[in-house]
Amino acid sequence: MVKLMKKLEDKKGIIEITFEEEREILELPSKPELPKYASQLINLANIFSQGTRPKVVGQMSELIKEFRKTGGRTFEDWKKWYLQKYPNAIDEATEKIWNMLNNFKETLEQLERDDVRKWVEDLVLIKTYEGLMLQDAILKKVAEELGGNYRPSTIEEESKGIDGVIIIDDKEIPVSIKSKTYVNQEKHLSEELKGHLIIYEKKKNKIIVDYSDLLDLVENTK
């Protein structure tokens, strides 16, 4: 007889159930045996193809509630009920994922080692530097928009939350450059930052920069 539950040695009243034991308790079929890395690849293909999205296989959290209301309990009850309700869903999801795997295969056949090296360089060197220097890029762009110049903040200015200085007509304007997420999370931002706020938000292929606070200041002092 298979031991389904094993007591933990360090504390009474606590047990552990392995995933294999769980499948046996619920009388589920054995976990499918797949080649190495296959599960991860199939899952990735599913993400890209959206094979198991609700529009294809149904909203599972709601379906299981609906199933329980029928009085069904066993896996076979669930399987029969689901396949009657969505007779083509498994095949449709399989087809979507399989097609995406074939797309992966075609791409892999075209890839060369140098392509992988370029990807690694882009991640480790370029994107890391880009993330660190994003504030400088924003500072430069905003200064250009305002017809002025800029300089990086000093160590003392940085300690006050100043990320850079915009220079217009020899007048220095300290600014704080923060992400929209950061601004939304900070309750007392105006009390902590000494510079005029520039807010940025990263989108898929661009960065949205809101310097309206600074623009109002510049226009009102002309």
UniProtKB/Swiss-Prot annotation:
It catalyses: Endonucleolytic cleavage of DNA to give specific double-stranded fragments with terminal 5'-phosphates. One of its GO terms (molecular function) is DNA binding. GO terms for biological process: DNA restriction-modification system. Its EC number is 3.1.21.4. It comes from the Archaea. Keywords: DNA-binding, Endonuclease, Hydrolase, Nuclease, Restriction system. A P subtype restriction enzyme that recognizes the double-stranded sequence 5'-CTAG-3'; the cleavage site is unknown. This is Type II restriction enzyme MjaI. It comes from Methanocaldococcus jannaschii (strain ATCC 43067 / DSM 2661 / JAL-1 / JCM 10045 / NBRC 100440) (Methanococcus jannaschii). The lineage of its organism: Archaea, Methanobacteriati, Methanobacteriota, Methanomada group, Methanococci.
